[in-house]
Amino acid sequence: MQGFLRSLFFGVKKIPKPFAPLVEKGVLKEALELKKDRYFLKEGFDIGKVEKVKDKAFFISLAKNYPKDPLIKNLPPSFKTDALILCQIECSKKRPIAFFKAALLNADHTMIAYLAKKNNQIVAIPFKEPFKKPVSLKHSQKSLLELPRHCVVKIDTKKREISEILGALEDPLIDENLSLSLFDRVKDFSKDCLNLAQHYAQLKASDFKDRINYSHIPFITIDPKDAKDFDDAIFYDQEKRVLFVAVADVSEFVPKHSSLDKEARVRGFSVYFPNSVYPMLPLSLSQGACSLKAFEKRLALVYEIPLDNLKNARLSQGVIEVRANCTYEEINHFLSANQSSLDKDLQQSLLGFLEMALKLKKERLKKGFNFNSFENKLYLNKEGRIEKIETEKESDAHTLIEEAMLLANQSSARLLDEHFHNKGIYRTHKEPSLEQQKRLYDKLFDYEIVRPKNMGFFPFLEHALKIAKEKSIEREVSRLIIKSQNLALYSPLQESHFGLGFASYTHFTSPIRRYSDLALHRLLKELLFYQAKGCSYLLEETPELCAELNALQKKAALIERDFIKRKFARLALELLEKEFLGVVLEVKDWVVVGLKEFIGLKVLVKTNKVFKPLEKVRVTITHADLILGQVRGEITERIKEHVS
């Protein structure tokens, strides 16, 4: 049903029989209009899911994107999280309002809950709505007592029976499965899918004809040290000033409409945890036949990009053999110490392209923005607890890969612009609205960063980061700036990418872990190598596909965030009643304090006292909630000077 409802945003020629009653006499009648022989959802109407947070209900659209999820008004209390509803949307400055119009599909009859004793009875408490009335189960109290304390279970809400046992809440090794289950991420591949993947994984590069042989070119991959799937490789020919970017040709192993394709599309993206990955494709492909492993012949789509004339980039179907799989750390060591066991031609390639990459980046940042995200990387021990936290900062090795990938992605967007009249699968990013900009100015004012009169938004961002660097508060200011931005989205129509400063952009370089890139590969291959016969068909599905991908992208981010929050809550349980030095990050209903010793751990403090962002404080951890992934505490001392 979701597929049909999503298609109404983009127009359907015919209403399928099972859904005709909804349209002819039912709840959708007033919300649809006929335009150019297609049924469309009228302007102002929207279809989406219910997401409950404490006593509030928010609306998550199936296809549209809002700066903030709309708050639902007049929702009947019987509606649970994930119910599908029709709403009328009223946009306001702060947060859009969704007025409930009709029910389309109540929530799935399954729920993740944990068992707890209430009034001497073991009951199930919903994870997503722990403040609601507990669910009494049909199982005997004796059988429930045999399960671990705070056992996490999946429940069939119609039958009020346990359908799956996930494990004990207190066990840190449950966290991956729990986060995936909470957001309905499909974990396992079907038998058909695995068999098909195994079949394709056994094919050799030599089995594929009409490909250019690039195996003499010494490509190199550069990835994080824990990477297992290698999507992309580069080589720079200094003499010809040509950059080669090779990207795994995944579409050769994933036929359109096959079980492999359908299950990849349902996932949309690979989900990454600190110690594992839940891939979009089976491991025999994602870490096997498609992965660009050193000294293995692999199928690839290869861009040859002349740096003196970027518009003359050429895309070919090739066979490559990567010379080395390297980590960012290894390449950074080589670039700083000029010592490496890499072959001389690889060393020359890296040094030559670094010089060009730094120039490209400098030029790009005249129009684009350098978002310093200060990503926190968690390292977990065998028990699933946080062992250490490292902050990863951008390096020259990152710049090498980033600039190469940006060039390949831009080259792909240029092909869409020229051949499909600005239609396809684009990656877009809207500039923050005036209201969003004003909120950021106000927050930065609290950080004693003032916007000079008549300074535009983009120059001010650079100005703010420059001051932040001088004040040694770059991390905090970067976090605020990133939070003020709109989400980058997939779009079937060309729009600019504000953050990067590009008029046109797409995703091409990660087809092992992103379905968007796989779909783009099919479109470009059809255009360049197969007489463009199937292009119109592939283009027709891009509006619906982009809407799906935007929803799946959000889901993947929520899964990863939920996991991290719970890991920090577990860490906090070991630190109860201990005092730490912290800095005030935010002041809203709660004062949010970031700990200096455990970067990324945020403590919520309820207080009547007035605090300012960047105040240095001492905070005691008093409570950690594994359900909500929250850590709470008390401020025991305020220190006058700002954090340095």
Swiss-Prot record:
UniProt xrefs under Pfam families: OB_RNR_1st (PF22896), OB_RNR_2nd (PF24190), RNB (PF00773)
SUPFAM superfamilies, sorted: Nucleic acid-binding proteins
UniProt domain RNB: residue ranges: 211-529
Signal peptide boundaries: none
Coiled coil: none
Positions of the S1 motif domain: 573-644
GO biological process, one term: mRNA catabolic process
Keyword Hydrolase tagged: yes
Compartments, as annotated in UniProt: Cytoplasm
InterPro entries: NA-bd_OB-fold, RNase_II/R, RNase_II/R_CS, RNase_R, RNR_OB1_N, RNR_Ribonuclease
GO MF term (any one): RNA binding
Reported consequences of knocking out the gene: No visible phenotype.
Source species, domain of life: Bacteria
Reactions the enzyme catalyzes: Exonucleolytic cleavage in the 3'- to 5'-direction to yield nucleoside 5'-phosphates
Top-level class of the enzyme under EC nomenclature: hydrolase
Record-listed E.C. numbers: 3.1.13.1
Any GO CC annotation of this UniProt entry: cytosol
Sequence similarity: Belongs to the RNR ribonuclease family. RNase R subfamily.
HAMAP family listed in its UniProt record: RNase_R
Name the UniProt record assigns to this protein: Ribonuclease R
Organism: Helicobacter pylori (strain ATCC 700392 / 26695)
